[in-house]
Curated annotation (Swiss-Prot):
Localization of this protein: Plastid, Chloroplast thylakoid membrane
Keywords, ordered alphabetically: ATP synthesis, ATP-binding, CF(1), Chloroplast, Hydrogen ion transport, Ion transport, Membrane, Nucleotide-binding, Plastid, Thylakoid, Translocase, Transport
Gene behind the chain: atpB
Chain coiled-coil ranges: none
Name of the protein in its database record: ATP synthase subunit beta, chloroplastic
Listed PROSITE patterns: ATPASE_ALPHA_BETA (PS00152)
A GO molecular-function descriptor: proton-transporting ATP synthase activity, rotational mechanism
Family matches, as SUPFAM superfamilies: C-terminal domain of alpha and beta subunits of F1 ATP synthase, N-terminal domain of alpha and beta subunits of F1 ATP synthase, P-loop containing nucleoside triphosphate hydrolases
Organism, as annotated: Glycine max (Soybean)
Enzyme class: translocase
Bilayer topology annotation: Peripheral membrane protein
Binding site for ATP: G172, G173, A174, G175, V176, G177, K178, T179
Recorded catalytic activity of this chain's protein: ATP + H2O + 4 H(+)(in) = ADP + phosphate + 5 H(+)(out)
Length: 498
């Protein structure tokens, strides 16, 4: 699907002054605007309110048309705070949807929902912009080839592989490592695939956004010396912003990613943290627009809004957008309408477990709960499929035996079950891995493990060849050779102590 990018539109002062409206009512972030007969703006048009407030401060608020109310009035949602606006203020119809800068000049920069840079590094060096509202690519433009997207993270590549051009959900509560996993993926994609990423911070903490930016600069994903060599563009609409901004910031990030796919013909990674906040903002806006809520207070248009965003994230014959979306699960209830609607669009789910995080196993990906539609012999091959299934069976058997072990102890198990438990504990530890972006916490250099190395390592553990090695040798290592080297070092250390 080709974008027809436009050059930046004229300044507001140069807009045709004839299509002017006036504010008739303000309800929080929602404005009712009256226009002259026959001059009604279209749905999704951007409106601009310029003027001065009661103390003489300059006001410049952009809004988006959401409803036509009749009687020459429209209802619009503001993209920034509405403090200082008054009834009777002049509103200019721009005649087009919100447009944001796109292209290579966006890399290494931070934008808000309107595509304005907010990193104090000056204006963006591009005149190419694209509207944030577009239809999904037509069926004939889609690429249907199934291919694995190698991440270099063992637990993901082996047990819940990502699809190139697919959508992946990252499920987890607070503090189990969603953001660290996202940062590692951005780092690995940039270094191993040379691809670009777009990060959409939707309704999350400002502090986290700042930390992410600083850590990206430290890890080299954002190159401060030569900003053009950066591998990621950041778009933030944080928790403190009005619901209009949080509802549209995901589309701003997606529009930037679409340009890299369609015009630059690149494989792009789109991160959305957090897709639940997109739904939450839509729910707030829906209530403000006076719509009747549906189940659990969510907006009646929940499926439509989610679909219009998700269907644009896909592979075309030009390139692909692979999307990784953090999904906050309210009260750990997966049947809540927000996560349940998200599930319908996903090709793979990576579930983070608090239990594994408590054991110190990072990434804390639950190997039994995480799933992928790609884990089929005809896609990944027999060897990968068989190894993954045997790893899951071993871990499942260990899970079943844990109650018996807790009550009676290991000694009461049969010889075969004891062997299964020993191998499962090695597998559990071998699924951990030192991350590049977490070097400051772990003190261990990060490791990228190829899929072939991952499969070889788990096959060796399952075959019983490494039964003699201590389980701590498998903790926080890269490939299996590092585990055997670590075992030798541990043995030498224990001999020295004797």
């Amino acid at each position: 699907m080709r974008i027809n990018p436009t050059t930046s539109g004229p300044e507001v002062s140069a807009l045709e002054k004839k299509n002017l409206g006036r504010i008739a009512q303000i309800i929080g972030p929602v404005l009712d605007v009256a226009f002259p007969p026959g001059k009604m703006p279209n749905i999704y048009n951007a409106l601009i309110v310029k003027g001065r407030d009661t103390v003489g401060q300059q006001i410049n608020v952009t809004c988006e048309v959401q409803q036509l109310l009749g009687n020459n009035r429209i209802r619009a949602v503001a993209m920034s705070a509405t403090e200082g606006l008054m009834r009777g203020m002049e509103v200019i119809d721009t005649g087009a949807a919100l447009s944001v800068p796109v292209g290579g000049a966006t890399l290494g920069r931070i934008f808000n929902v309107l595509g304005e840079p907010i990193d104090n590094l000056g204006p963006v060096d591009t005149r190419t912009t694209s509207p944030i509202h577009r239809s999904a690519p037509a069926f004939i433009q889609l690429d249907t080839k199934l291919a694995i997207f190698e991440t270099g993270i063992k637990v993901v590549d082996l047990l819940a592989p990502y699809r190139r051009g697919g959508k992946i959900g990252l499920f987890g509560g607070a503090g189990v490592g969603k953001t660290v996993l996202i940062m590692e993926l951005i780092n690995n994609i940039a270094k191993a695939h040379g691809g670009v990423s777009v990060f959409g911070g939707v309704g999350e903490r400002t502090r986290e956004g700042n930390d992410l930016y600083m850590e990206m600069k430290e890890s080299g994903v954002i190159n401060e010396q030569n900003i053009a060599e950066s591998k990621v563009a950041l778009v933030y609409g944080q928790m403190n912003e009005p619901p209009g901004a949080r509802m549209r910031v995901g589309l701003t990030a997606l529009t930037m990613a679409e340009y890299f796919r369609d015009v630059n013909e690149q494989d792009v990674l789109l991160f959305i943290d957090n897709i639940f906040r997109f739904v939450q903002a839509g729910s707030e806006v829906s209530a403000l627009l006076g719509r009747m809520p549906s189940a659990v207070g969510y907006q009646p248009t929940l499926s439509t809004e989610m679909g219009s965003l998700q269907e644009r994230i896909t592979s075309t014959k030009e390139g692909s957008i692979t999307s990784i979306q953090a999904v906050y699960v309210p009260a750990d209830d997966l049947t809540d309408p927000a996560p349940a609607t998200t599930f319908a669009h996903l090709d793979a789910t990576t579930v983070l477990s608090r239990g594994l995080a408590a054991k110190g196993i990072y990434p804390a990906v639950d190997p039994l709960d995480s799933t992928s539609t790609m884990l089929q012999p005809r896609i990944v091959g027999e060897e990968h499929y068989e190894t993954a299934q045997r790893v899951k069976q071993t871990l499942q058997r260990y899970k079943e035996l844990q109650d018996i072990i807790a009550i009676l102890g290991l000694d009461e198990l049969s010889e075969e079950d004891r062997l299964t438990v020993a191998r499962a504990r090695k597998i559990e530890r071998f699924l951990s891995q030192p991350f590049f972006v977490a070097e400051v916490f772990t003190g261990s250099p990060g490791k990228y493990v190829s899929l072939a190395e991952t499969i070889r390592g788990f096959k060796l553990i399952l075959s019983g060849e490494l039964d003699g090695l201590p389980e701590q040798a498998f903790y926080l290592v890269g490939n299996i050779d590092e585990a055997t080297a670590k075992a030798t070092n541990l043995e030498m250390e224990s001999n020295l102590k004797k």
